[in-house]
């Protein structure tokens, strides 16, 4: 895994570095909302709920996540760590994702396991924060 090699190199060069988290866009989110006839100007809880569904559910024939960036990171063994509203307020960020950005956490000791699980089952590994958000927003 290239990510594991890069992470180990970074750890060697930066003593104490032990957490590898991305801040990634969700470039198809607004288009997906339009396709689902969901108001992109909904309140924050509704936006969070829809972002979580967009990132973890699939409308695709292969069962992969709707979001191509999610598919990339999850396929590389990351877990869905956090969804951030109003994180990209650039015009492109607002047009493509309503400002939503996503953290993916790479746990180096779990990369292969998560990668294999994702490719076999398309299961999205989620952090405790995402599980708590799921409960709060009443998403199964």
Residue ranges of predicted features:
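Extended, composition-driven regions rather than compact fold-specific motifs
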Residues: 4-140
């Amino acid at each position: 895994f290239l990510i594991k090699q890069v992470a180990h190199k970074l750890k060697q060069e930066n003593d104490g570095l032990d957490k590898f988290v991305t801040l990634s866009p969700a470039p198809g989110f607004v288009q997906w909302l339009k396709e689902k006839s969901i108001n992109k100007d909904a309140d924050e809880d509704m936006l969070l709920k829809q972002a979580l569904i967009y990132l973890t559910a699939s409308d695709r024939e292969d069962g992969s996540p709707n979001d191509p960036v999610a598919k990339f990171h999850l396929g590389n063994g990351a877990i869905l760590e956090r969804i951030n509203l109003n994180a990209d307020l650039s015009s492109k960020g607002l047009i493509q994702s309503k400002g939503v950005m996503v953290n993916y956490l790479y746990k180096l000791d779990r990369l292969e396991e998560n990668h294999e699980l994702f490719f076999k089952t398309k299961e999205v590994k989620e952090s405790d924060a995402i599980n708590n958000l799921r409960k709060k927003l009443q998403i199964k």
